[in-house]
């Protein structure tokens, strides 16, 4: 009888120590990534001493290629550790060669890509036509495009992140930057 009452007392002590008003439910922390704080969408117009001008995001810097003294430039997106490389070509004779070369540049990443999504660019108001390539997967670049006025000007762009490719990790940032690149393309003004 003494043992039974001792067992009952111990069980009551254990049960009362596990509950009450100060009881806390402990759960393991969920696995999560870093929180990305995106800046507000605001743009500034740049007009380098070249045959084009366009709007760029306020959080970026545009640098012309000073080594080759051409109208090639880099749109540096420092906050996101990314750069949009822009190559300007004055069309002399062969527009189709430049279009095919841009397509090959995009499809060179098909080895690592899960898919390449093409989107036609048609903007008759600004006399701008071209193609966008969204490269899905762990490729070196996930976004490329070319635009032209079909007679004098050709601009090719490729977005690179300065990190090892991991599509799932960069996808939110990529989607944010792609909206700004789309705005850049929409606001191109050929001179």
Task: Please place each PLM-identified region on the residue numbering.
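Long, amphipathic, charge-rich alpha-helical segments that form helical bundles/coiled-coils
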Residues: 151-161
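Hydrophobic core
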Residues: 10-16
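Sec-dependent signal peptide recognition
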Residues: 2-9
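Short, surface-exposed beta-strand/loop micro-motifs that present aromatic residues
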Residues: 73-75, 142-149
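His/Glu-rich zincin catalytic helix
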Residues: 87
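A short, structured loop/turn motif at beta-sheet edges
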Residues: 123-126, 147-153
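Short, Gly/Ser/Thr-enriched beta-strand-loop segments that form substrate-interacting elements
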Residues: 129-143
């Amino acid at each position: 009888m003494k043992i039974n009452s001792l067992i009952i007392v111990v069980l009551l002590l254990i049960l009362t120590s596990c509950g009450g008003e100060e009881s806390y439910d402990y759960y393991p922390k969920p696995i999560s990534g870093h929180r990305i704080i995106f800046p507000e969408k605001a743009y500034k117009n740049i007009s380098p001493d070249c045959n084009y001008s366009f709007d760029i995001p306020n959080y970026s810097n545009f640098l012309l290629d000073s080594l080759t003294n051409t109208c090639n430039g880099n749109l540096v997106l420092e906050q996101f550790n990314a750069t949009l490389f822009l190559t300007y070509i004055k069309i002399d004779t062969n527009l189709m060669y430049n279009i095919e070369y841009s397509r090959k540049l995009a499809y060179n990443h098909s080895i690592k890509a899960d898919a390449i999504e093409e989107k036609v660019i048609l903007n008759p108001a600004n006399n701008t036509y071209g193609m966008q390539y969204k490269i899905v997967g762990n490729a070196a670049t996930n976004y490329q495009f070319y635009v032209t006025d079909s007679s004098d000007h050709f601009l090719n762009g490729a977005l690179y992140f300065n990190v090892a490719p991991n599509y799932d990790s960069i996808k939110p940032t990529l989607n944010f930057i792609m909206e700004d690149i789309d705005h850049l393309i929409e606001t191109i003004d050929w001179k």
